[in-house]
């Protein structure tokens, strides 16, 4: 049996529940990974919070039997995308992975695609295309938090075409994704101005960025830090208008959070949609050689009450780095 954390209805962290399920069996091109660590991300609580609820209404109209069939219980939906662990089973036509391999990966799916299991499970069934080898020098906790951060950061920088000599503003620079964006941009020869709380100023300096505090007077503080800004990556949301006022061309403004201002200023909605699984391997290699670090804010065990507490902390919005769920 495997333990799975998921939800059957939309709401706050209280909708998360734990269930014992049969061990997944890998099909063609699939593997099962015994999870050792799994990072959590804001998209997770947005999903179980009901961001896709309008789509559910459409489905109900089209297929009412899915919801109202007598005695039928709603399926448990999986939570989580990031993971790292040890391969415990392989399916047919899997030639480059064997049982015992240490891997990390990302469960990739569109938000409207219901997953019976996410990465918050003791055993994860996934396509072999969703995993990459874990470098031996990288801990499971760090590897387990890399998937979304690495793919999103690489995708965002690709989208806005960050190059050597650029001056890049990163909003939410102290977060899990923002910290990786900051380091990758600097590794390309760009200068980074990081927007974060004053408490994270020293942390951003340690990454090589120039910190500026959010709040009233932000635009002026950025102008004082850099006479000209050439690119803007918004990992927090709501900064497209600021980027426009700073004179950044719309095609060089990327945001991870869609808002009406994106269309108004011809900015770009970016992130994982512009990333690939190979980006995760690239960043994992950089973590292994020390050129990129992933800060782990806190770890919680894979127990439903602890997972609820982890998401509650993440929802507070002031996490430095990543929160990771661990299993033995």
Model region roles, listed by residue range:
Residues 69-81, 96, 103-172:
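NAD(P)H dinucleotide-binding glycine-rich loop of Rossmann-like/cofactor-binding domains
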Residues 144-214:
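Mid-domain Rossmann-like dinucleotide-binding core that forms the NAD(H)/NADP(H) cofactor-binding site
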Residues 22-39, 53-107:
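Glycine-rich beta-strand-centered segment in the early N-terminal region that forms part
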Residues 280-328:
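C-terminal hydrophobic helical "lid"/dimerization subdomain
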Residues 193, 206-270, 277:
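Glycine-rich cofactor phosphate-binding loops and adjacent beta1-alpha1 units
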Residues 43-45:
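Cytochrome P450 core scaffold surrounding the K-helix E-X-X-R motif
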Residues 4, 83, 153, 307-310, ...:
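Non-catalytic, hydrophobic alpha-helical segments
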Residues 4, 167-168, 253:
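Conserved hydrophobic helix-helix packing surfaces used for dimerization/oligomerization
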